[in-house]
Amino acid sequence: MAGNTGERPFVDIITSVRYWVIHALTIPALFLAGWLFVSTGLAYDIFGTPRPNEYFTAERQELPIVSDRFNALEQLEKLTR
């Protein structure tokens, strides 16, 4: 038999005006913040990932794949030059 936890039912929450007043501002603000985070390039700087135009340089057009695990450091040095 299911008991009562004393919490407010979910249907009551999402049909309340207070919920939508709060979330009508916060949900679009989160999307806007995420878009700005990526479009300004800050995400690339913080996480250290290369930007789309930095994956391949003019000198190196092949995929930078490490194929030999025992000589991985040598391969990485050669790939990052």
Curated annotation (Swiss-Prot):
Q: Which family does it belong to?
A: Belongs to the PsbE/PsbF family.
Highest taxon listed in the record's lineage? Bacteria
Spell out the PROSITE patterns in the cross-references: CYTOCHROME_B559
Task: Answer whether the UniProt record assigns the keyword Hydrolase to this protein.
Answer: no
User: What's a Pfam family in this record?
Assistant: Cytochrom_B559a
Q: How does it sit in the membrane?
A: Single-pass membrane protein
What this protein is reported to do is described as: This b-type cytochrome is tightly associated with the reaction center of photosystem II (PSII). PSII is a light-driven water:plastoquinone oxidoreductase that uses light energy to abstract electrons from H(2)O, generating O(2) and a proton gradient subsequently used for ATP formation. It consists of a core antenna complex that captures photons, and an electron transfer chain that converts photonic excitation into a charge separation.
Q: What protein name is recorded for this chain?
A: Cytochrome b559 subunit alpha
Listed A to Z, the keywords are: Electron transport, Heme, Iron, Membrane, Metal-binding, Photosynthesis, Photosystem II, Thylakoid, Transmembrane, Transmembrane helix, Transport
Its Gene Ontology cellular component terms are: photosystem II reaction center; plasma membrane-derived thylakoid membrane
Q: What gene makes this protein?
A: psbE
> Quick one: where is this thing mainly located?
membrane
What GO terms describe the biological role, i.e. biological process, of this protein? photosynthetic electron transport chain
- Spell out the subcellular localization from the entry: Cellular thylakoid membrane
Co-factor remark: With its partner (PsbF) binds heme. PSII binds additional chlorophylls, carotenoids and specific lipids.
> Which InterPro entries did the record assign?
PSII_cyt_b559_asu, PSII_cyt_b559_asu_sf, PSII_cyt_b559_CS, PSII_cyt_b559_N, PSII_cytb559_asu_lum
Q: Which organism is it from?
A: Synechococcus sp. (strain JA-3-3Ab) (Cyanobacteria bacterium Yellowstone A-Prime)
- What's the subunit arrangement here? Heterodimer of an alpha subunit and a beta subunit. PSII is composed of 1 copy each of membrane proteins PsbA, PsbB, PsbC, PsbD, PsbE, PsbF, PsbH, PsbI, PsbJ, PsbK, PsbL, PsbM, PsbT, PsbX, PsbY, PsbZ, Psb30/Ycf12, peripheral proteins PsbO, CyanoQ (PsbQ), PsbU, PsbV and a large number of cofactors. It forms dimeric complexes.
Residue positions annotated to bind heme are: H23
Q: Which GO terms describe its molecular function?
A: electron transfer activity; heme binding; iron ion binding
| Claim: Manganese is one of the keywords in the record | no
